[in-house]
């Protein structure tokens, strides 16, 4: 058979031909020049990244007649013999089919013999992770102390399956996936050498489908050339790789953003009718939104985009779709992609994901009016406060001239505090309970912010705990309307506050609200009643009961006694 596949014809023959592995080739070249190469190497990495090719190039370089050199000359008898496989001293073994103990024992017995044609005998064991445990054990001693004329190069795609005793005896080099840009650059050289005509963008599609493997890319290129004929077109590359045009993906993405379920399902059906794989299609959508998110957050990093070519349509769509919507779409598509692995009907999961994204977008949009409604309520409260300032505060301004604060006379009170209940709390109130509550108040407000309870936090801005017992506390409000809303449990505010306090303090405490204008009178009445009770008692009082009760409520450090 005269024809050879492109990946065989253009297999790297020098280190400079190995694409995307400069960190490895540079290290090996320096070791060759300084004659400090090891007796055993482990090359690990994804398929098609150059592990076996680098091993054969290294074998040629150490045995080149012009050694020490950093590149094989490919002209001497040793280099040519290793390239065409005629030199028996460079042995390439497939561990997948030679994984038994007997095969490794055969290597162990023959390794002691000196090479016949070149300086070093090189064993290249491909897919070494396929060896059995017994075979690895048989290789241990030879790998640790091989003869001076012998070099082992182990190659694997799954290094985690190799025993640590083997890995510790080798110099390990990890081959990385080749970038799409590097693959395209290599394919451009190949099509120029083959004098092939390719349409702009077709090589990028093939490189993207290769998933970082140069051999996969060249195999796809070979297939696409055979299919296309004279000119390799973008449509041919899309058809061969099973990829989807960015035009279709952008159209589907726009339908999802516009919440147009009908157009989205129609576009999806059109793509599936063309024979596109649902799993591959949903993966392309995930990468499309991923690239859009990166471009949106860091426009200068176009080099990190995997699948997308930044055009005018992509730019416009990235400006229209908010980042939060991209997060949600990526999350939904990723979950559906995982679920596709366990079903015989992947199309259904894709269609459900499309409908769910559109509905989620509707729900996200519906959340905005709720925020607007809360903001309107806050504005209404602020307007009510301003109205109270103009109608009620003027009358209250005269209260400092009186002996005790009174309820404003500017109008009838809409809320009357539960005096009896407040008196009961004051009888049981203690300073430690009040201090505990006040110290926890900041955490309570922070918790409300985490809950997104904007209206609840607004009600507590001008409130203050003034008395607390073991099972209830009194909360003073600057504005009567705030006190009334809490007492009536509007929007569940009182219930929510009591639940938060219970989770923080470990005990339930009932909230009793009192307006600031009424609090002074209620407290004064309680102190007077308590003083009369103490005066009617037969027990002598060592301290003025009024002062004692005041100390109990607000603390002795805040009391100043004047004769």
Swiss-Prot record:
Subunit structure of this chain's protein: Component of the DNA clamp loading complex consisting of tau(3):delta(1):delta'(1). The DNA polymerase III holoenzyme complex contains at least 10 different subunits organized into 3 functionally essential subassemblies: the Pol III core, the beta sliding clamp processivity factor and the clamp-loading complex. The Pol III core (subunits alpha, epsilon and theta) contains the polymerase and the 3'-5' exonuclease proofreading activities. The polymerase is tethered to the template via the dimeric beta sliding clamp processivity factor.
Record gene name: dnaX
Protein name as annotated: DNA polymerase III subunit tau
Organism: Bacillus subtilis (strain 168)
SMART domains in the record: AAA
The keyword Cytoplasm is assigned to this record: yes
Bilayer-crossing regions: none
Main location: cytoplasm
Family: Belongs to the DnaX/STICHEL family.
Chain positions recorded as ATP binding sites: 45-52
GO cellular component term, pick one: cytoplasm
UniProt key word GTP-binding: no
Subcellular location: Cytoplasm, Nucleoid
InterPro entries: AAA+_ATPase, ClpA/B, DNA_pol3_clamp-load_cplx_C, DNA_pol_III_gamma-3, DNA_pol_III_sug/sutau_N, DNA_Rep/Repair_Clamp_Loader, HLD_clamp_pol_III_gamma_tau, P-loop_NTPase
NCBIfam families given in the database record: dnaX_nterm (TIGR02397), PRK05563.1 (NF004046)
EC number, as in UniProt: 2.7.7.7
MF annotations from Gene Ontology: ATP binding; ATP hydrolysis activity; DNA binding; DNA-directed DNA polymerase activity; metal ion binding
Record-level GO BP terms: DNA-templated DNA replication
Job description of the protein: Part of the beta sliding clamp loading complex, which hydrolyzes ATP to load the beta clamp onto primed DNA to form the DNA replication pre-initiation complex. DNA polymerase III is a complex, multichain enzyme responsible for most of the replicative DNA synthesis in bacteria.
Catalytic activity: DNA(n) + a 2'-deoxyribonucleoside 5'-triphosphate = DNA(n+1) + diphosphate
